[in-house]
Amino acid sequence: NRPDPQIIWDKTNNPIWNTWDGYYHRSTKGGGYWEFKKKLPEYWTIKYRDLTFKVSPTNFKHTGIFPEQATNWDYITEKIKSCQEKEIRILNLFAYTGCATMVASHAGADEVVHVDASKGMVDWAKENMKLSHLENNKIRFIVDDVIKFLEKEKRRGRTYHGIIMDPPSYGRGPNKEVWRLE
């Protein structure tokens, strides 16, 4: 019983799978809930290099961080640190809780624009900014549908030196716009 539709490999009988601390139960109607062997705090923090991120299990299975993105965060850091531009502007679309936003800002981007359709995720990203002591860095937080935001930026003539995108396969914008990656 594995709730992720992306799991394509056969289940193994490795005894380590019986030592879980938290188990996510997916609902057939969407969402779900976590089951924990022992009581956990509502949230906790983890460190990634010099940054601190909030972790909190959600009813849609996520925890606020995708650790498998660390390789991409290292790449972002390397590219920003080696960039010869004077004013480095980075655009992070579908920015979620802002781990890549914080990485780009900490690496030296002069401005990072963080765009996500979910106000709750943008608020979480602001918490990650504070936890990582980046309040004095120029980070713009935008709650908007990504396509609508990009259309506005095009009309404004705004350009960026780098664009970070990790779109979901399906999602809804702040005004119920549907996003489907096909």
Locations of regions flagged by a protein language model:
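Non-catalytic substrate-recognition/targeting regions of SAM-dependent transferases
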Residues: 1-65, 74
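Conserved class I S-adenosyl-L-methionine
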Residues: 85-96
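Conserved SAM-binding loop of SAM-dependent methyltransferases across substrates and taxa
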Residues: 97-110
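S-adenosyl-L-methionine
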Residues: 117-164
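Switch II (G3) loop of P-loop NTPases
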Residues: 167-168
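Glycine-rich S-adenosyl-L-methionine
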Residues: 178-182
